[in-house]
């Protein structure tokens, strides 16, 4: 598991493509489903058990976010956000965090502003190339 710097107090992440497999499944009734990897769900559990606050800033709105946020008592949940940087700045101000106290995890172009703003930035293997060029760390 990735060891975070000791100064980190909060992990702020995108959802689709970071916690999910970056796919949307269309059911017979035209509802949508997402697949979560238990390793990613376990990461939420480990973060909470180690005293980290968690924030989710998602460009989409879906029930998987709400279920996970409730289960792990996620402090900040923001859905259907197209421009994420303002929400990220609001969270940082609310929790009085400096650049050494949070990490941002993203995978797509709408995360680039947040990744550029963050000192500690992480992405995933299937992130778009522009994000990989910005992120400092890629986790599997």
Tell what function each PLM region has:
Residues 19-20, 63-65, 111:
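Short, active-site-adjacent cap segments at secondary-structure transitions
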Residues 2, 37-38, 59, 105, ...:
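Short alpha-helix boundary/capping motifs
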Residues 30, 34, 71, 76-77, ...:
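Mg2+-dependent phosphoryl-transfer enzymes with acidic/Ser/Thr/Gly-rich catalytic loops
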Residues 39, 60-61, 82-83, 126:
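Short beta->alpha linker loops
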Residues 44-68, 79, 115:
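Substrate-recognition element of Asp-dependent hydrolases with the DxDx(T/V) motif
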Residues 1-53:
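Active-site neighborhood of HAD-like aspartate-dependent phosphohydrolases
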Residues 24-26, 68, 134:
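Short acidic, glycine/proline-rich loop/turn micro-motifs
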């Amino acid at each position: 598991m990735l060891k975070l710097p000791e100064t980190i107090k909060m992990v702020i992440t995108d959802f689709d493509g970071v916690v999910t497999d970056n796919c949307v499944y269309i059911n017979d009734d035209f509802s949508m489903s997402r697949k979560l990897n238990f390793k990613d769900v376990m990461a939420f559990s480990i973060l909470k058990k180690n005293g980290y606050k968690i924030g989710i800033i998602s460009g989409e709105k879906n029930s998987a976010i709400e279920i996970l946020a409730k289960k792990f008592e996620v402090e900040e949940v923001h859905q259907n956000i197209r421009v994420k940087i303002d929400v990220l700045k609001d969270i940082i101000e609310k929790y009085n965090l400096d650049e050494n106290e949070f990490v941002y995890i993203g995978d797509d172009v709408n995360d680039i502003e947040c990744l550029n703003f963050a000192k500690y930035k992480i992405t995933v293997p299937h992130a778009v190339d522009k994000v990989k060029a910005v992120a400092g760390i890629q986790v599997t």
